Design a protein with these regions (language model features):
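Compositionally biased Ser/Thr/Gly- and acidic/asparagine-rich
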Residues: 2-240, 244, 248
Length: 250
C-alpha cells in the first residue's frame, strides 16, 4: 500500500562497497556540519534502473533512484531523455528536510533534479517495470537544490505549517483529468516525519498529494484530510494559481 515503505538497510558510518549508480541512498548525519568524500568516475550515457514492481491491482511500490550524472537533470515525460514502462507514474517524490515531508514533482512542470539528489518513483500494476535515462535529460542548470519548473495548470495549493514543519497538497483542474487515480498526472501521498503535519486530499478511496480533477461549472467539493501528532497552532495558507478571479475556495 502507499503507507508501506519497507525497511532501510544501514551501510554504517563508512563503507568501501561501491555505491550503485542506479540506486538511490538516504544519508543521515547528526552533526551540524559534515564533509563526505565520494570517489569514482563521472557518469555518462544511458543508465537503466532496477525497480521493484508488483502485478497486483491497486498495489503501489516506491523506488528510490538517483540522478546519476555530474549535472542537473530534468524530470519529464517519456521521450525527453527518459524511457518509462507503462506502470511507472508521471510524478516523482523528493525528500524536503526543511518541511519534514516529501515534495511531489509532476512531470508536466519539467522540474530540475540537482546533482546528488535521489528521488522516489511510483510503480503500479507492473511486475517488471523498466526505467532508463540518457544524456538528453541533462541540463546545465547550476541549481544546488530541487527547483520546480513553470506550470500553467489551474490549481489550488494548500499548505499547513506547525511545529516548525510543513506539508502541501495540490488540487488541479484539467479537461482531460478523471475522478480516478491518473498514473501520469496525479501523485500519491507519501507520509513524512511524525512530528510534521500531514495534508492530503481524498478521491476514489486514495490519498493524494497531487490531485488532478475534471473541470467544473458551478461548485465542487473536494475532501481533504489533516493529521498531526503535535498539539499547538496550525497555519493554513491557500494559493490560487491560474484560476479565474470569480473562483473562491471554502
Amino acid at each position: 500500500s502507499a503507507n508501506n515503505y519497507g525497511l532501510w538497510v544501514a551501510l554504517g558510518t563508512s563503507t568501501t562497497t561501491p555505491l550503485s549508480t542506479n540506486q538511490g541512498y538516504m544519508i543521515y548525519y547528526p552533526e551540524a556540519s559534515k564533509t563526505y568524500t565520494f570517489v569514482g568516475n563521472l557518469n555518462n550515457g544511458v543508465y537503466s534502473y532496477t525497480l521493484t514492481g508488483h502485478s497486483g491491482t491497486g498495489v503501489y511500490t516506491f523506488n528510490l533512484i538517483p540522478n546519476p550524472y555530474p549535472s542537473s537533470i530534468v524530470w519529464n515525460t517519456s521521450g525527453n531523455g527518459w524511457t518509462k514502462s507503462a506502470g511507472i507514474g508521471g510524478s516523482c517524490y523528493i525528500w524536503n528536510a526543511e518541511n519534514g515531508n516529501y515534495s511531489t514533482i509532476a512531470s508536466s512542470t519539467g522540474s530540475y533534479i540537482p546533482v546528488g539528489q535521489a528521488l522516489m518513483v511510483l510503480v503500479t500494476n507492473e511486475a517488471s517495470p523498466a526505467l532508463s535515462v540518457n544524456n538528453n535529460a541533462r541540463t546545465h542548470s547550476s541549481q544546488a537544490f530541487y527547483k520546480s519548473g513553470n506550470s500553467t495548470e489551474n490549481k489550488l495549493v494548500i499548505r499547513a505549517s506547525s511545529n516548525n514543519y510543513a506539508d502541501e497538497t495540490v488540487v488541479a483542474f484539467a479537461e482531460e483529468a478523471t475522478e480516478a487515480f491518473d498514473l501520469q498526472t496525479d501523485g500519491m501521498k507519501l507520509f513524512g516525519l511524525e512530528e510534521a503535519p500531514q495534508l492530503y486530499t481524498l478521491s476514489s478511496g486514495e490519498k493524494y498529494s497531487l490531485n488532478n480533477l475534471p473541470l467544473f461549472q458551478d461548485q465542487r467539493n473536494v475532501d481533504m484530510n489533516f493529521e498531526t501528532q503535535f498539539t499547538g497552532e496550525v497555519t493554513l495558507n491557500l494559493s490560487l494559481i491560474h484560476i479565474s478571479e470569480p473562483t473562491r475556495p471554502y
